[in-house]
Design a protein with these regions (language model features):
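Short, well-structured N-terminal submotif of metal-dependent ribonuclease cores
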Residues: 1-41, 51-62, 146-158
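Acidic, PIN/NYN-like endoribonuclease modules and their adjacent C-terminal/linker elements
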Residues: 2, 112-158
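Short, flexible helix/strand-to-coil boundary loops that buttress conserved ligand/catalytic motifs
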Residues: 16, 54, 81, 129-132
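Short, flexible loop segments at the rims of nucleotide/cofactor-binding pockets, characterized by
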Residues: 17-20, 45, 94-98
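Short, hydrophobic beta-strand segments that form beta-sheet elements in well-ordered domains
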Residues: 41-43, 50, 117-120
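Short, surface-exposed acidic-centric catalytic microdomains
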Residues: 46-57, 71-74
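Active-site regions of enzymes building and remodeling cell-envelope glycoconjugates
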Residues: 59-68, 134-139
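Active-site neighborhoods of divalent-metal-dependent phosphate/nucleic-acid chemistry enzymes
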Residues: 67-127
Length: 158
């Protein structure tokens, strides 16, 4: 039984926009997590990012566990950011701040004991995850929202 998933901002941008090409995937994951009683978590960092263009009241907060950024997360973020900075030239990232969000969210996913998965459609973020996975032991798996939930979990979509 899976315990929890940390959902990033890109998930909510797709899930809350039924005209987005990834809406059906996001909706499928959301329903799957509810049905399987997999705890859905959202970081206060992702909430802040979402609020740049949306309103916190739009988020399905009654179905989410909010994860505040804490001291343990900050220490792990520093470790992750050091790895990313040392390999920055190899990543071929588009213009992007490394510490502000990707490494913070990954640190939260890694520190929170229940988190098994991190769900995102952000390909640049996935590059950073793959680098960290090669350099350190991460305890969570990156799930690409472009892959439907039934393919990810190997279940029939009936």
């Amino acid at each position: 039984m899976h315990e929890a998933v940390l959902l990033d901002t890109s998930f909510f941008l797709r899930f809350l926009n039924d005209s987005d090409p990834l809406f059906n995937n996001a909706d499928g994951y959301f329903r799957y997590f509810l049905q399987r009683e997999i705890t859905m978590m959202v970081s206060t960092i992702s909430i802040a990012e979402y609020c740049v263009g949306g309103d916190v009241a739009e988020l399905p907060l009654k179905n989410l566990q909010i994860v505040p950024f804490n001291l343990d997360h900050s220490k792990r973020t520093g470790e992750f950011a050091k790895i990313v900075f040392q390999n920055k030239g190899k990543l071929k990232l588009r213009e992007r701040n490394i510490i502000p969000n990707d490494t913070k969210l990954f640190a939260q996913a890694d520190c929170e004991k229940a988190v098994e998965f991190y769900l995102s459609s952000d390909k640049e973020s996935e590059k950073i995850y793959n680098l960290l996975k090669r350099q350190t032991a991460l305890k969570f798996q990156f799930m690409d929202l472009n892959i439907p939930y039934n393919e990810m979990f190997g279940v029939l979509d009936l």
